[in-house]
């Protein structure tokens, strides 16, 4: 149905504006934020890949569990729930991992409400051969998120938080 494809194209165009990206592979999926996490990681992580997960709440823990199930060599950085990471310390950790393929971070941890600054991390890995995956389920449209400028390779969100849009 051409009308249906027109609606999908309009949604994708609108999402590119919200995500601040020109990436043509920007699309909506009928599913939860966790389905976005699973799709992103299942497409990016291969067995034995070196993955760094930043953990400061429930969804960082969930990313770690998923990466382990996919067979990745998982390293983590953790701060107590309710705290954010110092970006300079994260960059130092990244520098110490010469075989790092993927770094995963939650921009705004739903379980604690903590906002994680990610711009410096993204700018650092942008020109490296490191994939930057960001969970923006709670943050998209509520705080600044610049997918292209910050070098984010894979970013997922959900409609139920700051976008305030019903699913479907």
Q: What does each of the following model-derived ranges do?
A:
Residues 1-29, 34:
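A glycine-/small-polar-enriched, mobile loop at the entrance of the PLP active site in fold-type I
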Residues 10-11, 28, 34-168:
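Conserved PLP-enzyme active-site core in the AAT-like
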């Amino acid at each position: 149905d051409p009308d249906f494809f027109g609606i999908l194209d309009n949604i994708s165009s609108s999402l590119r504006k919200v995500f601040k990206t020109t990436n043509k592979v920007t699309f909506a999926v009928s599913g939860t934020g966790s389905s976005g996490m699973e799709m992103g990681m299942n497409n990016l992580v291969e067995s034995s890949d070196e993955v760094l997960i930043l953990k400061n709440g429930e969804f960082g823990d969930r990313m770690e569990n998923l990466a382990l199930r996919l067979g990745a060599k998982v390293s983590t950085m953790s701060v107590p729930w309710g705290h954010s990471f110092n970006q300079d310390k994260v960059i130092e950790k990244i520098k110490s991992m010469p075989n790092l393929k993927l770094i995963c971070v939650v921009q705004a941890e739903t379980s604690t409400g903590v906002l994680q600054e990610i711009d410096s991390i993204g700018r650092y890995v942008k020109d490296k051969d490191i994939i930057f995956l960001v969970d923006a389920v709670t943050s998209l449209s509520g705080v600044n998120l610049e997918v292209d400028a910050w070098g984010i390779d894979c970013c997922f969100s959900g409609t139920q938080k700051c976008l305030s849009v019903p699913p479907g």
